[in-house]
Amino acid sequence: MDIGSIVAKYDVDRLSIATLASHSSLQIVHGAKLEGFRTAVITLRDRVWFYRQFSHLIDNFIVVDSWRDLCREDVVSKLREWYSIIVPHGSYVEYVGLSCAETIPIPIFGSRYMFSIEADQHKKMELLKNSGIPIPKIYTLNDEIDRLVIVKLPGAKGGRGYFLATSRE
């Protein structure tokens, strides 16, 4: 995939910012509007009613039955027609899958090569640690807990599967 050849065909005066409809998408399209861009939101069919209420922020909608439809040729064609640049958010890889996220032939704001790290909690924490960025202490079941901690269950996503604890019990 040669993103450069795709971008070369874009009319830079007609760029649009595209994102997946989620808790972060309204902030993304609001910022895009403030910067003078047109906007597009890809949304699930059962959620389109909600996002249509923000038509002052969203110029174009693509309605899909599954997030993984993002990589369908008709969806890609529509995004290219609108000269879209995808702005991913925290749910992007989880929603569309790593393969689609990395290979969709649409320009992405940021590095698509970071998606594999974003999708793997251990790789992500290792990168942060190696970069000198403080990360939370990781406890094992054998560790003594001496303060309030946030426990993340395996597979926890989207704010679910977490709880607070002050002891191993």
Predicted regions and their residues:
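N-terminal basic/disordered segments at the start of proteins
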Residues: T19-T39
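Conserved hydrophobic helix-helix packing surfaces used for dimerization/oligomerization
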Residues: L15-A18, V149
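Short, contiguous strand/loop micro-motifs
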Residues: R14-S16, S111-R112
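Short hydrophobic segments within beta-strands
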Residues: A18-L20, I42, A156
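Conserved N-proximal alpha/beta basic substrate-recognition cap immediately N-terminal to
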Residues: L44-V149, A156-K157, S167
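Short N-terminal or domain-adjacent regulatory/targeting segments
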Residues: M1-R14
